[in-house]
Amino acid sequence: MKGKKFSIFKLILITLILFGGIVGSYKAYDFVREKKLPFDLHHATGGPGIEKWIKFDPKEENFSVRFPNAPKHVEKDFPIPRSDDTLPYHEYQCSDNEMVVSVSYTVLPEDWLKWGSKMILKGAMKVVVAQLKGAHLVGQSTNTFKSYPALDFEHYLGDKETAGTLVLVGNTLYKVEITYPVHEREQVHNKLAQFIESFEPSKG
């Protein structure tokens, strides 16, 4: 039991660092429970796609993806408690009408991977939603994205909904998502599926 409590504490510590920190605690089942998503994020349907979006393939990064226009880059460093090291955080984001399209990532210390991909992915998602006060998790589901461990998610806050996937590539944790008005879910679905599919990570 002691080992289980410690691993949960370690996961909370990891996710607090990764996504900005929150006040609160979680029971063990909160990290393993899944909720079915209302639609398949990886299945494109009829409707407008991303054919006119531009390929974003920066030389300094280990991924490529398609954006509706040139994204802005935000870079931060999060301090690791009791360590001189920091976690780098990068986000590439742009807007297209009422949609916000984003790819973000951080690089984890190698020894954190011993806690397992599912624990890292689900814990990170829990903290992401909890950090957005008033947000509701519609669904989350573990998956495999192009051979990498992944977690699909959908949550909403007010009249805005966000859907996407977390992908763990080696020790790099990516978040690929689109935020859009709730009433436009059906119209955005095709673009969302194609945007996620356009994401091509590599281990560098």
What would you call each of these model-derived segments?
Residues 2-89, 96, 131-137, 142-145, ...:
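N-terminal targeting sequences that direct proteins away from the cytosol to non-cytosolic compartments
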Residues 89-120:
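A short acidic-to-branched-hydrophobic micro-motif
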Residues 108-133, 192:
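Long, charged/polar, surface-exposed segments that mediate recognition or autoinhibition
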Residues 147, 151-153:
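Extended beta-strand-rich segments in extracellular/periplasmic secretory proteins, especially
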